[in-house]
Each structure stands twice: as structure tokens, then as C-alpha cells.
A protein has these predicted regions:
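C-terminal cap/substrate-recognition subdomain and adjoining C-terminal extension
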Residues: 63-169
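Substrate-recognition element of Asp-dependent hydrolases with the DxDx(T/V) motif
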Residues: 26, 35-76, 97
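Juxta-kinase regulatory segment immediately upstream of eukaryotic protein kinase catalytic domains
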Residues: 163-186
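Metal-dependent phosphoesterase signature
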Residues: 2-40
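Short, surface-exposed acidic
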Residues: 1-6, 13-16, 83-93, 180-185
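Short, glycine/serine-rich, charged loops/turns that create anion-binding
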Residues: 56, 120, 141, 203, ...
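ATP-binding glycine-rich phosphate-binding loop
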Residues: 178-201
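A conserved alpha-helical element in kinase catalytic cores
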Residues: 207-231
């Protein structure tokens, strides 16, 4: 973003790109690693999740006039945000704001305990509610921001807000990947930053589940390497 905006006509180019990415090509977007697990862990703890987005109805310079808000909701629907058997987020808990000021008012109105954003400008506003704890997502210098937690992965965000991963978390995540109900889960020794669990289903089938370090912060292809070794 910053690189584009520094170029000649950079602001216009950036706005055009935003219109394409969040409009016509929104269907191709994927969730960040760790987001799905975070939402599932919020659900089993009965935490309410709100999505408050500063998003205009249409992209700038978009001749097709594709509704960015409608595309965002369609994408969330596809990713099962509103499915009560999955993330279970209430569709009414999604808010779109025309301006940053409107976004800040909505955050204050909802009395959020935490708010996560990847734009520093949101937290630098004097009108940001003082009772809401801030998490800035990304790689920023902590000393540049007052009273703001800076984290660069959703696993770290989950640990900050929800605490350490529990067996119930692991069971919930595994249930979304497997067709068989889980009977028992046991943590066994893991090496380094990896965590290994033994899972038994109700039909007595046994599986190993391994949780690797986040690829966002650790680029080593550990899963691929181990899989190739086993072949």
C-alpha cells in the first residue's frame, strides 16, 4: 500500500486496486492462518464477535459499480461465518461504516472489550473508546504506539485474548476437519514450537494431529518436509 501511494498517481492506483480486490475478485480471497481457529475458540467460550468495517458501498473508479459490502457478505457466507455449526457469528453483528468516524462510533456503541485492526490510523484517533483494548495486527515498532498491543499472527492474538490453547479447542478444531466424532484427545511430546496430539474417534480409530508454528512468522515448510520424508 505505502509503496503504491508514493508513486505518481499512487493514491488513485491504490483506490482502483482496492475496488478490484474487494469487489470483482473478492471471491478469491482466503482467510489468514489462525483466523478460523480464533473464531471457533471464541464460539466455544460464548464470546460475541462483531465485525466493524470502514467500507464504502462501491469501490472508487469502479465502472461496474460492484457492491463491496455485498461481496464481503457473500464471501463470509461462503466461508461459513454465519453457519451455526461452524463460526456461528450473527449476521446482524456485521457493520459497515461510510467513514472512520462512523466506525469509531460503532465500536464505542458496541462496548467492545477488544478491537483488532491492521490500520494504525484507527487506534491513533482520539475518539477511539478508551475502555476498548487495542490490538494492531502487523509488524510495527511498539514504541511508536501508545497503549496498543502489536501482534503479527492470529495465533498470538488468540493467546492474548483467550489464553493458552485447551483440549476443548483442539477437539473443536479437529471436529471441523474430520467426519468421525472424537472420543478422546491426549497431548503427547512435541519438539520445538510444534505441538502433537493423539486423537481417538468413537470408532476407536487413532490419529495424530500436529500444530505447526505459524507460516506467517516462520516460513520453513515443515509439513511439506516431513511429508516428503515419509514417502
Amino acid at each position: 500500500r505505502d509503496h503504491l501511494r508514493c508513486q505518481p498517481n499512487g493514491e488513485k492506483t491504490w483506490m482502483k486496486l482496492q475496488g478490484l480486490v474487494y469487489g470483482k475478485h473478492m471471491h478469491g480471497a482466503e482467510m489468514m492462518p489462525g483466523v478460523a481457529n480464533f473464531f471457533l475458540s471464541c464460539k466455544i467460550r460464548n464470546h460475541r464477535v462483531f465485525i466493524v468495517s470502514h467500507k464504502t458501498e462501491y469501490g472508487h473508479y469502479d465502472p461496474e459499480k460492484i457492491s463491496l459490502r455485498r461481496e464481503a457478505l457473500k464471501w463470509m457466507e461462503t466461508k461459513r461465518f454465519f453457519d451455526p455449526e461452524y463460526f456461528g457469528i450473527n449476521r446482524k453483528n456485521v457493520y459497515f461504516a461510510d467513514t472512520r468516524e462512523e466506525k469509531l462510533k460503532k465500536i464505542a456503541q458496541l462496548k467492545c472489550d477488544w478491537f483488532i485492526d491492521d490500520l494504525p490510523e484507527v487506534f491513533e484517533e482520539n475518539r477511539f473508546p478508551s475502555d476498548t483494548k487495542k490490538i494492531l495486527f502487523g509488524s510495527y515498532e511498539p514504541e511508536l504506539f501508545h497503549n496498543t498491543t502489536i501482534l503479527n499472527s492470529w495465533r498470538k492474538i488468540s493467546e492474548k485474548i483467550l489464553g493458552q490453547t485447551t483440549d476443548k479447542d483442539i477437539t473443536t478444531w479437529a471436529n471441523r476437519m474430520m467426519e468421525k466424532p472424537i472420543h478422546h484427545i491426549e497431548k503427547i511430546a512435541g519438539r520445538g514450537n510444534s505441538k502433537v496430539y493423539k486423537i481417538k474417534t468413537t470408532s476407536e480409530d487413532a490419529y495424530a494431529l500436529k500444530q505447526y508454528p505459524n507460516l506467517v512468522t516462520d516460513k520453513r515448510p515443515r509439513l511439506t518436509t516431513e511429508f516428503n520424508t515419509l514417502q
